[in-house]
């Protein structure tokens, strides 16, 4: 799945399993490595195991089996306060009775640093998050975004080996959340600190990460760079979870090297798709196709897949039109159409042709409902 070599790993989960009741496992034989300076995101729905992994790395949960290694040393039996790990939570966890300066000074005082060094580090950390003039304020006198910047600065001020972030932007509004994504990414690139980030928000993961581990049911479904996850999902779960996606269920009738033929719509249409994760001829499959890969009324002979479609809904979004169509019996087929004069006359109820390349359609494992 793109794991780095263990000899290069800065953080390493080695055959880690976790159970709370001794029977059902919330983490199942996890092997995951992160490089020094990497921004690695654990992405998945609620209950997928991503937060449990983060808590085990932080020391707030213990692995039932397996080993967790940080900078070449096993930390299974190292208490949280001795792991030299910074943490940023969704609820900020700032001390309300202390000023911003005092909040940042606290982890340094615990480490018994000299007063002048504490003052220098606090000053530098606040300037780093553009809050140099806010040191005398208390958390309640700050906006949500400012509080989150303070939380990030506090996690970095003692120069930890690694920073863990658990849904840190979940409490912010959409605009501020997007702004903080870029600020955290910029800080990471500037400081080259190792960050392990947990979220269920795919846009956060795609925006900030070097690599993303997609979790489901305690198992990593795919580990890859953001563009690879989006363009080349390895299974149906990843295809559905990352980005907007059209799915067409069918049966494989032929395989020719890297391209297979799939019957869909009760055998009324035969489509060609890239072989990715199928069980062979006669097996059920799910074709995954991104909306932006579909062309409306393509030129004759230009696409191997061309089918009839009925326009159901059109939504104007400025630079493009989002159209919901009925295709191969599915009335939730989405097409992103460039906003041009050529397509300006489309109306609900229109009959059109839609086409796409075989390489843009990925034949994956069938969903459980098929």
Where are these regions (language model features)?
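The feature captures the beta-strand-to-loop junction immediately N-terminal to the Walker
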Residues: 43-45
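ABC ATPase nucleotide-binding domain
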Residues: 12, 33, 69, 353-355
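Non-catalytic connector elements of ABC transporters
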Residues: 245, 254-370
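ABC ATPase nucleotide-binding domains
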Residues: 80-86, 90, 94-240
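Conserved ABC transporter NBD signature motif
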Residues: 66-74
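Conserved coupling/switch loops of ABC nucleotide-binding domains, chiefly the family-specific signature
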Residues: 64-67, 117, 217, 249
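Helix-to-loop junction immediately C-terminal to a conserved catalytic motif
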Residues: 58
């Amino acid at each position: 799945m793109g794991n780095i070599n263990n000899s290069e790993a800065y953080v390493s989960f080695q055959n880690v399993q976790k159970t709370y009741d001794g029977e059902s496992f919330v983490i199942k034989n996890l092997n995951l490595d992160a490089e020094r300076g990497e921004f690695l995101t654990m992405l998945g729905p609620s209950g997928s195991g991503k937060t449990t992994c983060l808590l085990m790395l932080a020391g707030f949960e213990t692995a039932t089996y397996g080993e967790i290694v940080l900078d070449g040393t096993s930390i299974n039996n190292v208490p949280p306060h001795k792991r030299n790990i910074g943490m940023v939570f969704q609820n900020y966890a700032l001390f309300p009775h202390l000023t911003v300066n005092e909040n940042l000074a606290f982890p340094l005082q615990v480490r018994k640093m000299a007063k002048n060094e504490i003052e220098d580090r606090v000053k530098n950390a606040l300037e780093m998050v553009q809050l140099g003039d806010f040191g005398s304020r208390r958390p309640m006198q700050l906006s949500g975004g400012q509080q989150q910047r303070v939380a990030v600065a506090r996690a970095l001020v003692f120069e930890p080996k690694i920073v863990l972030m658990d849904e840190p932007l979940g409490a912010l509004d959409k605009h501020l959340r997007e702004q903080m994504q870029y600020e955290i990414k910029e800080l990471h690139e500037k400081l080259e600190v190792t960050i392990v980030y947990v979220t269920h928000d795919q846009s956060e993961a795609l925006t900030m990460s070097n690599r993303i581990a997609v979790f489901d049911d305690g198992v990593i479904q795919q580990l890859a760079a953001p563009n690879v996850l989006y363009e080349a999902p390895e299974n149906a779960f990843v295809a559905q979870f990352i980005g907007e996606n059209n799915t067409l269920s069918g049966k494989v009738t032929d395989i020719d090297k890297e391209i297979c033929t799939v019957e869909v719509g009760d055998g009324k249409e035969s489509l060609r798709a890239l072989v990715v994760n199928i069980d062979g001829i006669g097996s059920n499959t799910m074709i995954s196709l991104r909306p932006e890969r579909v062309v409306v009324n393509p030129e004759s002979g230009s696409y191997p897949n061309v089918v009839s479609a009925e326009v159901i809904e059109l939504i104007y979004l400025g630079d493009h039109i989002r159209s919901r169509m009925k295709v191969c019996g599915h009335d939730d087929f989405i097409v992103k159409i460039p906003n041009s004069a050529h397509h300006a006359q489309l109306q609900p109820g229109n009959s059109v042709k839609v086409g796409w390349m075989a390489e843009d359609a990925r034949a994956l494992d069938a969903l459980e409902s098929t």
